[in-house]
Amino acid sequence: MNTIVGTYECKVDSKGRLMMPNPLKKQLNVSLQEGFVLKRSVFQQCLELYPMKEWDLMMQKINKLNRFVKKNNDFIRRFTAGVRIIEIDATGRLLIPKDLAVFASVTKDIVLSSAVNIIEIWDKDLYEKAIDDSVGDFADLAEEVMGNVNDDEYGIS
């Protein structure tokens, strides 16, 4: 798994295209040839851009679900609803399909935010609200999520 780093502000043109920032393109160099998968986020009103290798890993996990369990089928259907294969063109632009742009309220000003191994694509105002709303709770969240992690191999304890 490659870790993606950075938060970048961009603009979307009238056709729904955005220019991938150069620092992000450099990090995704290998993925540029393989393509990406773009989908709705499960928890937020944003989009998730998966490098194809990361998407394949996610699909390996999902393929382990028993398809004879109704809620597994419901999850798979909803998780993959609206999923699109996306390529970055020769000029470095990425086209956001209209239905996904509507879901995430992507119109003009957007934020590309790294989320470990994927990129979240946010409407700028919604991103700032999501970050601002969680500032007070972040210390508690960090303690709850990471406080019990004891992994000296990576320096987390």
Curated annotation (Swiss-Prot):
Keywords: Cytoplasm, DNA-binding, Repeat, Transcription, Transcription regulation. It is found in: Cytoplasm, Nucleoid. The keyword Cytoplasm applies. Belongs to the MraZ family. Forms oligomers. Signal peptide: none annotated. GO terms for biological process: negative regulation of DNA-templated transcription initiation. Residues 7-54, 83-126 form the SpoVT-AbrB domain. This is Transcriptional regulator MraZ. GO terms for cellular component: cytoplasm; nucleoid. SUPFAM superfamilies: AbrB/MazE/MraZ-like. CDD domains: MraZ_C (cd16321), MraZ_N (cd16320). GO terms for molecular function: DNA-binding transcription factor activity; transcription cis-regulatory region binding.
